[in-house]
Design a protein with these regions (language model features):
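Alpha-helical junction/boundary sensor with strong preference for TPR arrays
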Residues: 32-34, 54
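Alpha-helical linker/edge segments of TPR/alpha-solenoid repeat scaffolds
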Residues: 45-64
């Protein structure tokens, strides 16, 4: 599969809220030999965004 095809699969996983699978696919795209620099940057930014979303904690909900 080409980097572009893998990127589309990663985007589909992200849209379906399958963040773990999306991160794995984004990493595969970033490591692909045929990936452009722009595509690699998009993948890295997407991974960082997903990790930021997953690490969000609303501290107001933790107060008794």
């Amino acid at each position: 599969m080409t980097a572009s095809e893998l990127f589309e699969i990663a985007q589909e996983h992200r849209r379906n809220k399958r963040f773990g699978d999306a991160i794995n696919m984004y990493r595969a795209v970033a490591e692909a030999e045929d990936a452009t620099e722009q595509l690699k940057k998009q993948c890295i930014a997407s991974i960082e965004l997903i990790q930021e979303i997953n690490s969000f904690v609303n501290v107001d909900l933790l107060n008794p």
